[in-house]
């Protein structure tokens, strides 16, 4: 179990450091900023690369909502759920701390929202709580459907990380303007701890919606996808 938890810790660290790091450092860099598209690709690439790197050790969840969904789908033991979630959240917090230390090393830096997730006045596009709740549930559900489908025994081995990474990229392309894209409670928690205030007050949604969506995606998959 120790190796699995370390794999989840480092995998989630890489997801937050690479994905949120691209948003903090490179998204709006003067003249050469990577924008929403670059950030979306960064998140997708972090999952793709770490799924290949450590997925064989832990399963490559890197996300409490994924762990919940896999548990509901019967692909993951419930007894391992809490340790996995703790490892994922710890990895996200350490990554956010590293990003904070690096970012504050620049004189006059304005951290803004520090890649936190939000709704209402803290949504990049000013979207409401209901909009944020729905999009996070729907996108996390489809993320789980992609994960469960691409890792099914009837699918050729070795291609799942590509499908999963591309799915996460698409998810970000859709929802960055709405919530800054969570679909991952650990990712949201790490950034919110360093923003404080409103980010912590709104954090509940980015636990509730992805977990509901993850469980819903697993149920939907079980209704039709597990049938041969």
Curated annotation (Swiss-Prot):
Keyword set, alphabetical order: Cell inner membrane, Cell membrane, Membrane, Plasmid, Repeat, Transmembrane, Transmembrane helix, Transport
Location in the cell: Cell inner membrane
GO molecular function, one term: water channel activity
Span of the signal peptide: none
Gene Ontology cellular component terms for the protein in this record: plasma membrane
Subunit structure of this chain's protein: Homotetramer.
Domain writeup: Aquaporins contain two tandem repeats each containing three membrane-spanning domains and a pore-forming loop with the signature motif Asn-Pro-Ala (NPA).
Name under which the protein is recorded: Aquaporin Z 2
Naturally occurring in which organism (per UniProt): Agrobacterium fabrum (strain C58 / ATCC 33970)
